[in-house]
């Protein structure tokens, strides 16, 4: 249900959010050569979900989703500042908010699981520290803080029978390059509880070293012959940790509405590069 919320808002150039029911109807109507969607991913925050909703309210949401013909799959924890959470690289208070967001996500997952609407899927997180400037002030210490926060989050998830997936995007500190992402995953060292979610556009940008030129595997103007071995090196490194996959909405060059580095957020459906 992400496209109904990401990049949406009341700022200049933004469209208003699309309601949950409308998103479900649009998804149910999507069909190509007889292929339809059988499930959805789901962001655990307003306006689609109040993360503090009662069990009965959550069961009502699950009924609505199942009534449209869908299972609930991966959940997106509200880890960012302005939602429930805050930076995984921040102060003790900020990190506490991050962990509280993971706890809330696990609680909602349990309700959906017991209801029967959710049978599989991960809980998606990232470092919730936008941009790499602050991270660069002390890379080792800041990565260490993220690792520590993610370890605690992974323990919470494991205690609830859940698995976290850190989505590698070039805008999130400590996760902004394939090598730095690998450092975090290996630093946590809990593959049964924390893995990697590959985003198709951002793994492409990982290969270019967009926010980490020192980790670039190809340069702009690359040939096909140069690109594929480089891409394979990146995928070989991250494959053992990869537990979820995000089909990108563009080719890594489109800038949609919103603030994500390079790719913006979700681009219009009729964009030729979409």
Each PLM stretch: what is its role?
Residues 1-119, 141, 151, 158, ...:
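N-terminal pre-domain/capping segments
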Residues 3, 44-46, 78-81, 127-131, ...:
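Active-site-proximal loop/turn and secondary-structure-junction residues that shape catalytic pockets
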Residues 6-8, 75, 81-85, 125, ...:
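Short acidic/His/Gly/Ser-rich catalytic and metal-binding motifs that mark active-site loops
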Residues 11-19, 49-60, 89-101, 134-145, ...:
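Alpha-helix N-cap and loop-to-helix initiation/capping positions
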Residues 40, 123, 245:
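Receiver (REC) domain switch-region micro-motif
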Residues 100-102, 129, 147, 251:
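Intrinsically disordered, low-complexity segments enriched in polar/charged small residues
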Residues 109-139, 160-171:
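Active-site groove signature of glycoside hydrolases
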Residues 141-143, 147-268:
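Acidic/histidine-rich catalytic cores of soluble enzymes
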